A protein has these predicted regions:
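Short, extreme N-terminal segment that most often corresponds to the first beta-strand
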Residues: 1-25
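Charged interaction segments
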Residues: 23-116
Length: 116
């Protein structure tokens, strides 16, 4: 079964060409983004042409080729634009396994609550 996470990635319209170029060079990244994502909002996430991808219960391991290509894509986005151009949020199975990267899309965040 393995350890699974819920992940959201959003990027600005300015970052989309970098995303598409990276996906064009990596079949694994293309599959991750355009086949494996449970939800895709392509150009219509906000009124500015941003993209959003949402994966639920995904094995998000740095050693996987798709994740390596994804991380390289993020590096290119930061290099060409900056960290305001994206937001990546990952919630793991463990209560303290939460990660947030990028400074764009501040309305995407982790919310904890008590359920009963």
């Amino acid at each position: 079964m393995g350890y699974r996470s819920d992940v959201i990635f959003a990027c600005t319209a300015d970052a989309v060409p970098t995303l598409l170029a990276a996906a064009g060079k990596s079949a694994a990244l293309q599959e991750l983004l355009f086949a494996d994502a449970d939800e895709q909002l392509l150009g219509d996430y906000d009124s500015h042409g941003s993209y959003l991808f949402h994966w639920t219960s995904i094995k998000w391991y740095d050693g996987y080729p798709a994740i390596q290509a994804f991380n390289q894509m993020i590096e290119k986005i930061v290099e060409k634009l900056d960290e305001e151009a994206y937001r990546w949020v990952c919630v793991g199975e463990e209560m303290d396994d939460n990660e947030i990267e990028g400074f764009g899309f501040e309305h995407i965040y982790i919310s904890r609550e008590i359920a009963y």
